[in-house]
């Protein structure tokens, strides 16, 4: 695999699935602010003129789901009917039940350290030293493109932009190292009045060029900007949106494996979310410590059981110490029991809405992005 191409995509906060994710996590945050021990599994569906919020929530908190929903849609930028979706006039329906007591008895324990996993499942975490944030470059730059689209839309630089957008970046690799960008796709919703030529020029100058490193762009790099020629109808009017449908965008852009569980709308007792964050934390610290250039962690659980049923460390031949030693170091320095990882990463706080667009990983202010264990791991591994 000397030379190859690899592609990742991202979507903006105004993409229908991301609207749903953000509403689900906004509800979660509002509940955790009042009741950190709440059990939340909140799912959202959006379509033209309608939002349906459902799921299972057990809490002492009271939150106004309609207000949270409208505020979230408003912040994203859907504030007028000519966009096909309006925070002020859309219908908001709620169908919320309580978490099953059968699950509760497996999760809740008198001794918090024995808190069981909220479900069975397998989760992956990944890190690589090919970017400054120890994330794969394709997903990192795909995210940054749609973040930039939102920035120039909101600050008025390109006032004809609308909230829905998608990006895709194809990188060229040679012997595992980046040598350039082969192709860039950026599709953005826009108002009626902008013509295609002006849009393409503005997107190139204001979105693509400020984000993608010039040394990776060549005369052979292909650019596809709104390749259909028109993207006026977008957001929930163009497609329905559902929580949890962008799990590869949320993680590593396909560069690492995925256990299948979505994140948004789930409180930290759900290991689909919290253990995936912990696995990223472990992998990132291993790479930051210089123990490997690339690292993938798998962890798995049985419902109602505290100890993980398995922990795997994969370094793709880039390890600087024996793989068996890495596994022992992970078990020594990281508590991957559900309660342990919640405490380790301080997860019982309203920090989740911000994760719901532009990726859960690679943004330094999230607690699972800390590299505070790197030096300890390096010393324990016997590296200077």
UniProtKB/Swiss-Prot annotation:
Kindly state one GO CC term assigned in the UniProt record. cytoplasm
The segments labelled Flexible loop in the record are 99-109
Residues reported to bind Mg(2+): 17
Which InterPro entries does the record match to this protein? ADOMET_SYNTHASE_CS (IPR022631), S-AdoMet_synt_C (IPR022630), S-AdoMet_synt_central (IPR022629), S-AdoMet_synt_N (IPR022628), S-AdoMet_synthetase (IPR002133), S-AdoMet_synthetase_sfam (IPR022636)
Q: Where does ATP bind?
A: 15, 164-166, 230-231, 239, 245-246, 262, 266
Q: Which Gene3D superfamilies match?
A: 3.30.300.10
Keyword entries, A-Z: ATP-binding, Cytoplasm, Magnesium, Metal-binding, Nucleotide-binding, One-carbon metabolism, Potassium, Transferase
Any idea of its EC number?
A: 2.5.1.6
Compartments in which it is found: Cytoplasm
Q: Which cofactor does it need?
A: Mg(2+); K(+)
Q: Molecular function (GO) terms listed?
A: ATP binding; magnesium ion binding; methionine adenosyltransferase activity
Record's catalysed reaction(s): L-methionine + ATP + H2O = S-adenosyl-L-methionine + phosphate + diphosphate
Q: Provide the binding site for L-methionine.
A: 56, 99, 239, 270
Q: Give an example GO biological process.
A: one-carbon metabolic process
What's the short name of a Pfam family annotated to this entry? S-AdoMet_synt_M
Q: In which pathway does it act?
A: Amino-acid biosynthesis; S-adenosyl-L-methionine biosynthesis; S-adenosyl-L-methionine from L-methionine: step 1/1
- Similarity comment: Belongs to the AdoMet synthase family.
Protein task: Catalyzes the formation of S-adenosylmethionine (AdoMet) from methionine and ATP. The overall synthetic reaction is composed of two sequential steps, AdoMet formation and the subsequent tripolyphosphate hydrolysis which occurs prior to release of AdoMet from the enzyme.
Q: How does it assemble?
A: Homotetramer; dimer of dimers.
The name this protein goes by in its record: S-adenosylmethionine synthase
Species of origin: Escherichia fergusonii (strain ATCC 35469 / DSM 13698 / CCUG 18766 / IAM 14443 / JCM 21226 / LMG 7866 / NBRC 102419 / NCTC 12128 / CDC 0568-73)
């Amino acid at each position: 695999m000397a030379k190859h191409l690899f592609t990742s995509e991202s979507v903006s906060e105004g993409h229908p699935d991301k609207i749903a994710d953000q509403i689900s996590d906004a509800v979660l945050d509002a509940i955790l602010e009042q009741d950190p021990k709440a059990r939340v599994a909140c799912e959202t569906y959006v379509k033209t003129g309608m939002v349906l919020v459902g799921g299972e929530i057990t809490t002492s908190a009271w939150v106004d789901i309609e207000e949270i929903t409208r505020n979230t849609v408003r912040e994203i930028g859907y504030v007028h009917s000519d966009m096909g979706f309006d925070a002020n006039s859309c219908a908001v329906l709620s169908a919320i039940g309580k978490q099953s007591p059968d699950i509760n008895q497996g999760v809740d324990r008198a001794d918090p350290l024995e808190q069981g996993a909220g479900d069975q499942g397998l989760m992956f975490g990944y890190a690589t030293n090919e970017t400054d944030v120890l994330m794969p470059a394709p997903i990192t730059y795909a995210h940054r493109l749609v973040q930039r689209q939102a920035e120039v839309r909101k600050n008025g630089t390109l006032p004809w932009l609308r909230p829905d957008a998608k990006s895709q970046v194809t990188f060229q690799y040679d012997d595992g190292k980046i040598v350039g960008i082969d192709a860039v796709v950026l599709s953005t919703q826009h108002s009626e009045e902008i013509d295609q030529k002006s849009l393409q020029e503005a997107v190139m100058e204001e979105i693509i060029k400020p984000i993608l490193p010039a040394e990776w762009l060549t005369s052979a790099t292909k650019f596809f900007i709104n390749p259909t020629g028109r993207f006026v109808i977008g957001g929930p009017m163009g497609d329905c949106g559902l929580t949890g449908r962008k799990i590869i965008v949320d993680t590593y852009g396909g560069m690492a494996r995925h256990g299948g569980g979505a994140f948004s709308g789930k409180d930290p007792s759900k290991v689909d979310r919290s253990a995936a964050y912990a696995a990223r934390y472990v992998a990132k610290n291993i790479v930051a410590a210089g123990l490997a250039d690339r690292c993938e962690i798998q962890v798995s659980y049985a419902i109602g059981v505290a100890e993980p049923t398995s922990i795997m460390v994969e370094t793709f031949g880039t390890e600087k110490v024996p793989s068996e030693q890495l596994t022992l170091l992970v078990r020594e320095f990281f508590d991957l029991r559900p309660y342990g990882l919640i405490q380790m990463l301080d997860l019982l706080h309203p920090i989740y809405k911000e994760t719901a667009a532009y990726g859960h990983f690679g943004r330094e202010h999230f607690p699972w992005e800390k590299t505070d264990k790197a030096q300890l791991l390096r010393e324990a591994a016997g590296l200077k």
